[in-house]
């Protein structure tokens, strides 16, 4: 089933909840970039988190960019997510694999902390008007969810819980997705409600398991986690938003990027390489430019 995102409020509008499934999206990214299991999971989590952040943007063309800059062997990670449900992303070292570590429940898990190393999470929110808003926070764990929650608390002053997860077996990635829970000003003034919400979030011991049990139904995930808070989709009756991996790169854009190199550099490429080859970082699409096309491009710059 196709990936989807659903928005809801709970507790009479005092709590905002967003759930997203990204299984198909993550599997597509894995095939495009040739990702290992570790980098598949890290990119899947980052794409889920990016979509959760973009879900609150006021305009349909608004976008959020997440960039992990660190000294870890993953060599960086970048995600571009839109309010429209379209997302793309890549990692610097797609084939990275590390030995598993023991998680809190005693099971073997991915070593996100070693993969990410120490560094920062950079977030840019672009509403399509004026200057984009950017913020940087130190990485908390490299697990993505904790890092994004830290960003929301320190940069947007919004108490939030962010859960991202996945399930993998011998057949590959089975599920991927995320859940965002935010306390709105109305609820912040009700200590009992805040305490109940915190209790529900603490009860989420294994988000990946809950995600897998809900399959491709994000609305069931919300009902399962918060049954006593009366979650309601917003706006009522709105179909869930489709989510997909989408990159707007094109041959025309690639040719435009080549012109930025200038005629001298292009002439050198024509003489020595007899053409040019460009690869999109976000989707690994390769664009080849032959001699005639490169010569015409140089002529257009004269």
Swiss-Prot record:
Coiled-coil regions listed: none
Organism expressing this protein natively: Synechococcus sp. (strain WH7803)
Main location: cytoplasm
GO molecular function: protein folding chaperone; unfolded protein binding
The keyword Lipid metabolism appears for this protein: no
Keywords for this protein: Chaperone, Cytoplasm, Disulfide bond, Redox-active center, Zinc
UniProt protein name: 33 kDa chaperonin
A GO-annotated cellular component: cytoplasm
Cystine pairings recorded for this chain: 247-249, 280-283
PANTHER family: 33 KDA CHAPERONIN
Modified how: Under oxidizing conditions two disulfide bonds are formed involving the reactive cysteines. Under reducing conditions zinc is bound to the reactive cysteines and the protein is inactive.
């Amino acid at each position: 089933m196709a990936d989807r995102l659903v928005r809801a409020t709970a507790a009479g509008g005092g709590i905002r909840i967003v759930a997203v499934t990204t299984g198909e999206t993550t599997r597509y990214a894995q095939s495009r970039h040739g990702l290992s299991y570790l980098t598949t999971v890290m990119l899947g989590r980052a794409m889920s988190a990016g979509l959760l952040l973009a879900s609150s943007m006021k305009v349909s063309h608004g976008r959020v960019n997440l960039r992990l800059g660190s000294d870890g062997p993953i060599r960086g990670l970048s995600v571009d997510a839109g309010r429209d449900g379209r997302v793309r992303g890549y990692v610097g070292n797609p084939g990275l694999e590390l030995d598993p570590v023991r998680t809190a429940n005693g099971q073997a898990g991915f070593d996100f902390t070693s993969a990410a190393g120490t560094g920062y999470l950079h977030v840019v929110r672009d509403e399509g008007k004026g200057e984009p808003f950017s913020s940087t926070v130190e990485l908390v764990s490299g697990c993505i969810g904790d890092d994004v929650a830290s960003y929301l608390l320190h940069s947007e002053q919004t108490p939030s819980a962010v859960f991202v997860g996945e399930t993998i077996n011998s057949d590959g990635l089975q599920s991927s997705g995320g859940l965002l829970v935010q306390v709105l000003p109305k609820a912040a003034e009700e200590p009992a409600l805040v305490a109940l919400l915190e209790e529900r979030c603490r009860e989420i011991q294994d988000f990946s398991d809950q995600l897998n049990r809900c399959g491709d139904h994000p609305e069931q995930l919300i009902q399962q986690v918060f049954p006593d808070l009366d979650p309601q989709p917003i706006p009522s009756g709105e179909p869930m938003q489709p989510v997909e991996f989408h990159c707007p790169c094109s041959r025309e854009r690639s040719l435009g990027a080549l012109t930025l190199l200038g005629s001298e550099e292009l002439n050198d490429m024509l003489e020595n390489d007899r053409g040019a080859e460009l690869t999109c970082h976000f989707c690994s699409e390769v664009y080849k430019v032959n001699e005639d096309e490169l010569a015409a491009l140089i002529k257009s710059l004269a």
